Amino acid sequence: MAKVSKRLKALRSSVEANKLYAIDEAIALVKKAATAKFDESVDVSFNLGVDPRKSDQVIRGSVVLPKGTGKITRVAVFTQGANAEAAKEAGADIVGFEDLAAEIKAGNLNFDVVIASPDAMRIVGQLGTILGPRGLMPNPKVGTVTPNVAEAVKNAKAGQVQYRTDKAGIVHATIGRASFAEADLKENFDALLDAIVKAKPAAAKGQYLKKVAVSSTMGLGIRVDTSSVNN
């Protein structure tokens, strides 16, 4: 088990376990506690008042974070013809069709996001057992199956994050890195929150935003007072 630094111990002792912190204070505490030797990711979880067992209450989508994710995203695109050239010009790292499918079947998965034009889905569909478990399968709900592949590439490169409720009705997403300014993390948080609020299912009843927490890869997890966020 990794040793806990004295500083992190002190920070943990300064955080009240049952206290709900204002979002600005929570972000500041998480940043302060991110003392690992790498640039930790800053993550947020939203516990939502939905029933994920019902298909009409599953939330899934994507949003471009205004300050980016702090991560270099490698993008693979399944398309052909003029779209292939447009994807390359937009910054796609890998562009192909049957040849790209063959590369993936051979185990070459050096990318973080897969985008496909609708005409390519007959090929991409055959890769479901490979891409699906890795969360890479293109889906129109998150904008990765689209006739405008160039725009999708630009969004992915600009810091687009995908979100989806898990089996417990919780959305987990990254809003940046510990090296980000507090104001930038807050701006990204607000953009993600806005997207999730707008995605509220009509069938969802009662309180929608039940719990919120902010954390870093190796640091603290801070519970957030939902009244402190603009929802």
UniProtKB/Swiss-Prot annotation:
Q: Give GO MF terms, alphabetically.
A: rRNA binding; structural constituent of ribosome; tRNA binding
A GO term from the CC aspect: cytosolic large ribosomal subunit
Respond yes or no to whether keyword Endoplasmic reticulum is given for this record. Answer: no
Family matches, as CDD domains = Ribosomal_L1
**Residue ranges crossing the lipid bilayer per the database entry:** none
Keywords linked to the UniProt accession: Repressor, Ribonucleoprotein, Ribosomal protein, RNA-binding, rRNA-binding, Translation regulation, tRNA-binding
Q: Which domain of life is it from?
A: Bacteria
Tell me which Pfam families the record gives.
Answer: Ribosomal_L1
- Gene Ontology biological-process annotations: regulation of translation; translation
Gene3D superfamilies linked to this entry = 3.30.190.20, 3.40.50.790
Family, according to the entry, reads as follows: Belongs to the universal ribosomal protein uL1 family.
What is this protein's function per UniProt? Answer: Binds directly to 23S rRNA. The L1 stalk is quite mobile in the ribosome, and is involved in E site tRNA release.
Q: How does it assemble?
A: Part of the 50S ribosomal subunit.
Output this protein's name.
Answer: Large ribosomal subunit protein uL1
Native source organism of the sequence: Neisseria meningitidis serogroup B (strain ATCC BAA-335 / MC58)
Gene giving rise to this polypeptide: rplA
